Amino acid sequence: MGLQMTAARPIAALSLLVLSLLTWTHPTIVDAAHPPEIIRKPQNQGVRVGGVASFYCAARGDPPPSIVWRKNGKKVSGTQSRYTVLEQPGGISILRIEPVRAGRDDAPYECVAENGVGDAVSADATLTIYEGDKTPAGFPVITQGPGTRVIEVGHTVLMTCKAIGNPTPNIYWIKNQTKVDMSNPRYSLKDGFLQIENSREEDQGKYECVAENSMGTEHSKATNLYVKVRRVPPTFSRPPETISEVMLGSNLNLSCIAVGSPMPHVKWMKGSEDLTPENEMPIGRNVLQLINIQESANYTCIAASTLGQIDSVSVVKVQSLPTAPTDVQISEVTATSVRLEWSYKGPEDLQYYVIQYKPKNANQAFSEISGIITMYYVVRALSPYTEYEFYVIAVNNIGRGPPSAPATCTTGETKMESAPRNVQVRTLSSSTMVITWEPPETPNGQVTGYKVYYTTNSNQPEASWNSQMVDNSELTTVSELTPHAIYTVRVQAYTSMGAGPMSTPVQVKAQQGVPSQPSNFRATDIGETAVTLQWTKPTHSSENIVHYELYWNDTYANQAHHKRISNSEAYTLDGLYPDTLYYIWLAARSQRGEGATTPPIPVRTKQYVPGAPPRNITAIATSSTTISLSWLPPPVERSNGRIIYYKVFFVEVGREDDEATTMTLNMTSIVLDELKRWTEYKIWVLAGTSVGDGPRSHPIILRTQEDVPGDPQDVKATPLNSTSIHVSWKPPLEKDRNGIIRGYHIHAQELRDEGKGFLNEPFKFDVVDTLEFNVTGLQPDTKYSIQVAALTRKGDGDRSAAIVVKTPGGVPVRPTVSLKIMEREPIVSIELEWERPAQTYGELRGYRLRWGVKDQALKEEMLSGPQMTKKRFDNLERGVEYEFRVAGSNHIGIGQETVKIFQTPEGTPGGPPSNITIRFQTPDVLCVTWDPPTREHRNGIITRYDVQFHKKIDHGLGSERNMTLRKAVFTNLEENTEYIFRVRAYTKQGAGPFSDKLIVETERDMGRAPMSLQAEATSEQTAEIWWEPVTSRGKLLGYKIFYTMTAVEDLDDWQTKTVGLTESADLVNLEKFAQYAVAIAARFKNGLGRLSEKVTVRIKPEDVPLNLRAHDVSTHSMTLSWSPPIRLTPVNYKISFDAMKVFVDSQGFSQTQIVPKREIILKHYVKTHTINELSPFTTYNVNVSAIPSDYSYRPPTKITVTTQMAAPQPMVKPDFYGVVNGEEILVILPQASEEYGPISHYYLVVVPEDKSNLHKIPDQFLTDDLLPGRNKPERPNAPYIAAKFPQRSIPFTFHLGSGDDYHNFTNRKLEREKRYRIFVRAVVDTPQKHLYTSSPFSEFLSLDMREAPPGERPHRPDPNWPAEPEVSVNRNKDEPEILWVVLPLMVSTFIVSTALIVLCVVKRRRQPCKTPDQAAVTRPLMAADLGAGPTPSDPVDMRRLNFQTPGMISHPPIPISEFANHIERLKSNDNQKFSQEYESIEPGQQFTWDNSNLEHNKSKNRYANVTAYDHSRVQLPAVEGVVGSDYINANYCDGYRKHNAYVATQGPLQETFVDFWRMCWELKTATIVMMTRLEERTRIKCDQYWPTRGTETYGQIFVTITETQELATYSIRTFQLCRQGFNDRREIKQLQFTAWPDHGVPDHPAPFLQFLRRCRALTPPESGPVIVHCSAGVGRTGCYIVIDSMLERMKHEKIIDIYGHVTCLRAQRNYMVQTEDQYIFIHDAILEAIICGVTEVPARNLHTHLQKLLITEPGETISGMEVEFKKLSNVKMDSSKFVTANLPCNKHKNRLVHILPYESSRVYLTPIHGIEGSDYVNASFIDGYRYRSAYIAAQGPVQDAAEDFWRMLWEHNSTIVVMLTKLKEMGREKCFQYWPHERSVRYQYYVVDPIAEYNMPQYKLREFKVTDARDGSSRTVRQFQFIDWPEQGVPKSGEGFIDFIGQVHKTKEQFGQDGPITVHCSAGVGRSGVFITLSIVLERMQYEGVLDVFQTVRILRSQRPAMVQTEDQYHFCYRAALEYLGSFDNYTN
């Protein structure tokens, strides 16, 4: 304003200034005052009595007037009753009268306004009050008033109001006695209804609607409108990052998001500085942008609303590289190490330090040590006496900082390691020589001098040589030499540490003018017959050298040679023998004479291919499919090296030699198997060295043995008459004859009339040289089945298909025959009587009578006339079956026969046993066998034998044995002694006569047995035995080892192993933890020697290293680790390893590489070792043995380790050969060596010339880029793959550009005027990618190069053909040469005989016997027929009847009442009787497993020794075209009274998933029982064969998982199965028991029994067999089947037959119930089931069950509840279960001396170093219903253990603690207060800070923050203390306690971590047991609808003693469970 004033108007300006001042001091001067004015007058009102009257008055003025109300001239006060005065903005005043009263309120009312300016103004109105019904007509009446409403903020509400009157009343609304302002746009009024939109909190209040017309005014009743507002305090939905690390100068956005209701404002602060302006604070989200950050800072995000404020701090940390360390100091300097120390003054966020060092001034890279976390380090492995410089670098998470200043030092001296170099000697005269040298290369110190040694006799020790000391100069002169003598000179250097090694000897001749010694004499190129020598001429030759003298001798001919050669520095010495060691030396000669020679150097010539084939090749056909082949090596003089392999070729005669099968091996014998039957083979052999194959031997022609033939062809049968049939046939097909057909068998069998089933005994007719035969002696009018079988020498073959033919009728039918006994003694006589046939078909002419012993030739008699109808037979044999046949005859012929069988009574045998045979098993063990007496003398069934055996001189005073077998074994016989043997037989009637005395004489000299036999387990399946060898005297062939788990006398029942001339052997495939007896005998040419003493070994490794593993196996190294032996304390460990591998080299030759054995000795504390310098793809035999303190022998533990494959070795480049037809290029392709792994395939890659490819090498062309693809653009000159060649089929020559396809790659046509390069890529057969080697590029190739030369194309050398013709050397034949003829013959004879013996033994053990007399041995107990239903007899009982083994006889079933005592007897003496009983289990039969051993089935077996018996295996329907598709490693197993109740199988492999599910489908199985986890002890036990989610397809089976339930000890999975082509869906449940420990058996059987009962409950009765598997399908699987079957047996019988059932199972699958521990566990489980019974109750029956428990039954003294609780207490406590708890250092930590945790379930704490017992706390892990170790049951902590209690909670992540006691009860301390009350307290490492305490009606909840002071981490722990448990007894009701349990578990689910809930009372067993029991019982009721309080407590007591301590507590568990059920209708109704 001042800027606009001008000088022309000074007066106006002045006036304005004065006015401004006056305005500031007296503002009224400017603003004029206004008197009051009423702008709204009150209106007259008429109201009902009791209604509401409201007068409104408004006034204005300046200043605003005040309004008062007057009634009848008197002021109305707002404090008066019923009168209210309300003042509102805008000068409005309201007078409200409520309720109005007649006679008191009807009066005039005046509104008076005044403001001190002018006079007061007023306006009045009259209130008229109508009583009752005196209201005027038309008075408004509200017909619908508003009601109370509740809405949420933001919603719309409609307040209703309707009124009537005349005139129509006007309606308006009052809120909180004030008229509603309808100018608010959210308010609207329609037809009297008030609508409020988008409601707000201020809309809440009391509302009235008012109806008004000229007749009066009516108010509605006041009603409330409530507006609900969600009030949520602010929280961060996305708090800012706690810490952000950024680089210096970078940018960062910090986001902070908060929510709440109302939404909070969000702002950022840096310290106390606001970074967000108040007027710009965003709601909900705020992003802070930090730009060019220069410093670390704390930023705080604050979110605030009306309900509070929260904040979160974000640290922005600026990162930078660390500074350099300072003050690097060096100390403790030694010859090979120094200690560095340094300081660091930078920030503390370093990760580690790096030390760099190298010799100072050396031109080499720094060595580096990384990862140092201290500020000192000892640098080792330095070179002695070397100046080093060191740098230290600090490293943080950004990177490395700058290096420190260098620190230098010189390492100390040490003993010298090298000798003086380049020693040179020359003669100055014949008596003086001068010697010069150079200092040692690594003196390791300062050289102080030298000592020169010289002598004329170098064989003397150096101490006897002449010597001369020299200072540190490098030259000296020696005088007074003997002229013409040859001196040897050596030089030795000295340092302060002493003398170093001597130099290499140098020779010189003390003669002036002769040359000195040539130097550097060496062999540079060594061949098979020649060697190239090189040397350096003498340094001092004085005169010119005229020639050299070369000397050599060979170790083959033991001859010395000498040759004079010309003056040069190289020479090739030839004419040598291959593979021979030579010593070669050299001297120079001048005109004066010959100088000193060089030292002899050893040179071995290379090996060469053998010059002769193997000798004495012998072939023997050992069966119809095998040939045994043996040979001797080639003659030694023609081997040309070490023979490392042999190749055997065999081919059928008539086929080409190149079709022969080749076998490579490193032994001199082999059995060729899987040959064709009765087929001629041509066989030849060659030998090979490392160079290649030698010449072939002359072929041998040999035919395999005969076999049984196939079935005859075109069989026809025609009836000739009523008793004869003509049969004709053709021989079997040529391919099926399998030998010379020597005849035929015709089998005729009578059929029943209806054609179903056979009748009477079959007929068999032998036919020799014809193809037709008349079968006679048949019955008329009878159907017969006719079959024909061919015969070879091996027996009769397959029968032809049966032909049914019927003989003609018309002959008499069968007569009725009866038989009666006439006499029994002294002879047997019977009378046969018959009746006339019912139909004779003509005149009956008589009868034919045939009779005799059954299966013998029958006598025949014709009886004429029909009147003869009886016949007497006298003098019949005793004890045999007679057959009598009677038939009538008519004019047609003989009629049908009636057969009558009669068993004659038995008598005593009439003769002795026959065919007595003796055999010495060893010289002192005799085996005698015999047959029963001959049939005519047998007189009945032989029941036993009496055997007498004694020395001849004892005159019958020997032993007598009663035997049921026809075999006796006698041991410990004396040498050169005669023994007498005789035997007699018994029938039921008594004994027969003894046999004649058989005299047996033992050898005169049995020789001594092997001594000092020892055995020791080397693993859980192997053992090693060793012994002192027997003095051979030239006759010893080897040894035979006998071993068995049952040490019977008969060595034929022992397992055997034959070994050669050795002193140790390994026994494999032994039973884990089983006890074996072992003995050994020497093998001589004439048999075995005396048997050694027997030793026993338990297959439990104790003195060998355990858990030998190979880790980190690479191409050139492996790391071994092992554990120490259990018993032995070693002083060292010894590692030894060797290997041999055969591979094909780059020329196609088979090479054998032998890695010699290496040994490594390690200290006893070393448990891991890395072996380096290994070869790729080589299988090493690794042994680790523990060396005891006496250094005696201990066997090693062994593994085989194969190193990784590597890329092939480099190849040569492809070569050009020539252009063919102008279109193709013939190239020669290289082949790669397979030394580092088998080659999978080769690629031939063509690279057209292109600028982009000129500088690339072949390896730069990636295979993926070369492979054709749809999305790859084609470049005109792009490289491509022209061909792919499979393994070993790469051609030597190849036509490039032919246009042909090679394994889906096209050999494209070549273009003219374009150049190409090619290379070959060899790919190793390994899953790893890019493991290949590429050859170099070929030269550039094009079609305009030269044509290919004419003639034969080049070819790769044939590895089967010798490279050079055989060279023969003529030698003088003299007498000693005879030895070279005789000796090989002797050796070959020995080898052949040994091979035959081994072959026989192996064949006897491997091949099942197929002869008829073995049928009873191999016949299964029952055929595997799936369709068979339950049999009337139990399969175990049937086995006891049919196969009475000694074990079954001596182990009968046990009555249930005696079972507990029986187990106690078996467990006595450390389970000795259990061991004996378990080891005696033997099915008494031999079974085959041929299908498992078929080559195509071997990969389907998880373990090689666990196979499926053929007779009981599960046969799947074969898939057409798939060999072996009917096989799965599974067997049917019998249950109780149910055949094939189970299928025992192995854990499925990846390749058997389809077979497994196919088996489930085919068998209609509904239940799979899985007894293993997928992985145990880091070993794969079973592959996951089911889908984790969704559906998986297994072949034609679709498996869908529909439900998974995981419980503490088992899991249940439900699957739906569909099959392709089938409409039905099937449900299968899989129950997996997960509580079986990795090692051994479960500690207690109760969880397993619970699992087993669940399995049975979920298995439908009509389903197929239950499939049970573990890993091998024999151990745990057997346990399940036996226990399940025994539980079923107990329901129906009063006996237990575990022994019988295990025996039965072992006849159906091998190794069932695999260990003794499993066998004992079965007994314990059955005893547990007997003692406890079945206590599981359906939930709906709980009330009835509880009532029964509380009743004392008649005749009983205690109730069922007491009985159950007493059973719980019948658990024997063994002090060995509480080892740690009873230690003296832990006893004070136990509140009660008898409540201690079991060792197996106690809670382990991390031990504190130096504090004994620091790992102990009195607490136990307890399993819940769904989780293992879900709870910790602990005692109330004592004062000494409070710190351990918090340590337990922290280490095991337990964040919920349940306390069920008060600190003191009944005046005694029950628990120490282990928690802080008001402030934080530290318990050892942990700081416990109380957060809050909540007092609930029944419990207290305390929250604590627990912080680990070591790292600052923290977590919240909540403690629930139940305070309603009475100090005595139990709660009256369980309802409160159940609610408490629910609250604890609900909190656990919401806030708890994965750890267990810790529960404690005082002792941690009583109330704690109740809490855990009810938790489990209630949860199980929810899931299964059943409960089992007894078993639940029983299982708890197996984890902690005395759980649920009193009977009251036990009863309370039942009551609480019942109360819980009462809240559910479905259980109570």
UniProtKB/Swiss-Prot annotation:
Record's compositionally biased regions (Basic and acidic residues): 1346-1358
Residue positions with a glycan: N176, N253, N298, N553, N616, N666, N721, N774, N915, N962, N1183, N1304
Keywords recorded for this protein, A-Z: Cell adhesion, Disulfide bond, Glycoprotein, Heparin-binding, Hydrolase, Immunoglobulin domain, Membrane, Neurogenesis, Phosphoprotein, Protein phosphatase, Receptor, Repeat, Signal, Transmembrane, Transmembrane helix
UniProt-annotated stretches for the region Disordered: 1346-1369
Cytoplasmic side: 1403-2029
Keyword Cytoplasm on entry: no
Domain notes: The extracellular domain (1-1412) is sufficient to inhibit bdl function.
UniProt protein name: Tyrosine-protein phosphatase Lar
